[in-house]
Amino acid sequence: MTDKRYGGEIERLRSPERVALMEVDRVLELALAGVTLKSVLDVGTGSGLWAEAFAQRGLSVTGVDVREDMLAAAQAFVPNATFKQGEMETLPFPDESFDLVFLGLVLHEATGLATALREMYRVANLRVVALEWPYEVGEMGPPQDHRLRAEDVLREARAAGYAQAEHIQLAHMALYRLDKRNLQPWCV
């Protein structure tokens, strides 16, 4: 267990203020752009907000989280998804199990950025997308010293073997789109 992990209430993860900051529709558009996907792994699924969003788009969704109470909440919100307990650095899935691996505001909680990115690479078939808090002081989210610098994420992604690594600054968040192979230029 790491002190960087979210230990708060489930309800807070779905607060209207927090959801508005995440730009759910825009993030889904960017995550799904330029690739045909059937399966998604939602790492650090929490209350299942992202699992629910992907499932509503017809994708087969599996969520993983370290907290049993989060998994129970996620299952209640997304009964047609599969949820499993596990840690992002040692995911309980075979290589290339999911077309997309998604991390919604959890990559900064990894005990090691390089280790986590390598593990995401291992279980992803096509793409990894991480939504993160920007590297700045903010009223919501983790303290700045837990947040990730864009240059660090991109450097470690390339070192992990990703063929394409992109940082997209959203209105309130940072999005990292990491592809295992060179795909067609992204059209969004």
Language model region names:
Residues 1-35, 49, 129-156:
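Conserved class I S-adenosyl-L-methionine
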